[in-house]
Amino acid sequence: MTDARPVGVVVDTMIISWFFDQHPNPVADRYRALIGTRPVLLAFQTVMELRYGALHAGWGELRRRRLERRIAELTVAQPDDEMISICAELRQGCRQVGHPLGDKVHDGDRWIAAAAIRLGLPLASHDGVFAGAPRLELITVAPGP
């Protein structure tokens, strides 16, 4: 029996938005290269942020349906009891070491990180808030601090 590592990458809202966008984006291309052929997964929080962004921007029904079709092509990690506990532990762990994910303003980001930790997968993000978060494996091309 082998210890097979889960396959896939959780991507945050910024990255998946870049992937869904049809405009050329060299940074998005770098993330595509890093992710390669691994399956892309979304946290439920990312789906909420995508839908909110579409509503806030006043997208029409056709464009919102196109977004929903793109989301439906991917696996969405839904919260379960273990993810909820991981999110609480992550907040406490971050608060103890002074990491910004411990702050309330980052509740959404923390859920995305908790989804990646729960699934045992890396998180692809261009957001520096995730750098150095306990238990989180981060894939990024963002410049360091």
Feature annotation, model-predicted:
Residues 41, 77, 139:
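General small-molecule cofactor/ligand-binding pocket signal
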Residues 11-12, 43, 105-106, 127, ...:
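Histidine- and aromatic-rich ligand-binding microenvironments
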Residues 16, 47-50, 130-131:
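A generic structural signal for short hydrophobic patches within well-formed alpha-helices
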Residues 1-4, 113-145:
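Acidic, PIN/NYN-like endoribonuclease modules and their adjacent C-terminal/linker elements
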